[in-house]
From Swiss-Prot:
It is an enzyme of class 3 (hydrolase). One of its GO terms (molecular function) is pyrophosphatase activity. Its EC number is 3.6.1.-. The lineage of its organism: Bacteria, Pseudomonadati, Pseudomonadota, Betaproteobacteria, Nitrosomonadales. Residues 6-149 form the Nudix hydrolase domain. The gene is rppH. PANTHER family: ADP-RIBOSE PYROPHOSPHATASE, DIHYDRONEOPTERIN TRIPHOSPHATE DIPHOSPHATASE. This is RNA pyrophosphohydrolase. Coiled coil: none annotated. Gene3D superfamilies: Nucleoside Triphosphate Pyrophosphohydrolase. SUPFAM superfamilies: Nudix.
Length: 172
């Protein structure tokens, strides 16, 4: 499902623990790390897609997390032409995403990267909220920064990462 501007609707998930560290998944058989994300199927709301993707990619159910916030609008990124399937060229530009900030209220042991028959990740870790972006594929970095910045306001005040100090320090 691609919109008239060439963007595929998608959800992104920033999962944090009680220390406001964020979940990073290592793409299977690759050396890049990313947040869980995935397409919104026809008839799904962004929230329904988020819970489906959370289960498929991380093995977590709704009772394992609490929604802290979501982005107000779609955040978009363009995919480089050489990454686009030949049959999609000309009609597909990239992804438009609604991002969710979730708090893990379950245990680390509830995470299961093998919850689906087609796993996305082969490893995971907790990292500081304002983690360096050098391990994220380049064309997604700006959207990650925008989502992290917008959603940081939903974190517990005394544990909130300091945006003004850290956003300029993110590796480009």
């Amino acid at each position: 499902m691609i919109d008239r501007d060439g963007y595929r609707p998608n959800v992104g998930i920033i999962l944090c623990n009680a220390r406001n560290q964020v979940f990073w998944g290592k793409r299977i058989r690759e050396h890049s790390w990313q947040f869980p994300q995935g397409g919104i199927k026809y008839g799904e709301s962004p929230e329904q897609a988020m819970y489906r993707e959370l289960m498929e990619e991380v093995g977590l159910r709704p009772e394992h997390v609490k929604i802290l916030g979501r982005t107000r609008d779609w955040l978009r990124y363009d995919v480089p032409t050489n990454w686009i399937k030949r049959e999609w060229r000309g009609s597909y530009r990239g992804q438009k995403q609604i991002w969710f900030l979730l708090r893990l209220i379950g245990r680390d042991s509830d995470v299961s990267l093998r919850a689906s028959t087609h796993p996305e990740f082969d490893a995971w870790r907790w990292s500081d909220y304002w983690v360096a972006m050098d391990s994220v594929i380049e064309f997604k970095r700006d959207v990650y920064r925008m989502a992290l910045k917008e959603l940081s306001m939903h974190l517990t005040e005394h544990r909130r990462p300091r945006v003004a100090e850290r956003v300029d320090q993110l590796v480009r």
